[in-house]
């Protein structure tokens, strides 16, 4: 099991686990923030996906999450702390690259969804090859209420 730490909370934002040969689980691990995609989380996902893409021994990638939610989308608190155009352009370019990588890796990607999956969190699910949702799973793109629209792949 490996993890990448969040500089804000010093918690592992992403946990990797091999449960059986050929299957790897990446678990989003910012449960107190509903697994919002912080800069650290996006970077950790990109690094993990780049590494996974080159592994012939892995056939299946499961995206999971700890806590009450799968993923609340971008970290709005972090976004509000940087209210300038260049920050948003960089953030969305980073997210777009990660989402594109997710769609292009050779492994089958399964999103294991519980709780809410909103905005970019809903995009994570949409970019998976297959989604398995619990009875309590909820999907939304509520950013339109803030003048935002999810436009990455």
Predicted segment positions?
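Hydrophobic/aromatic residues within transmembrane alpha-helices
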Residues: 26, 63, 75, 124-126
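Conserved CoA-thioester-binding segment of acyl-CoA-metabolizing enzymes
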Residues: 1-66, 82, 100
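Hydrophobic alpha-helical membrane-association signature
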Residues: 41-45, 91-94, 124
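Glycine- (often His-adjacent) and acidic-residue-rich active-site loop
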Residues: 5, 65-100, 117, 147
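CoA-thioester-processing core
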Residues: 98-104, 112, 118-153
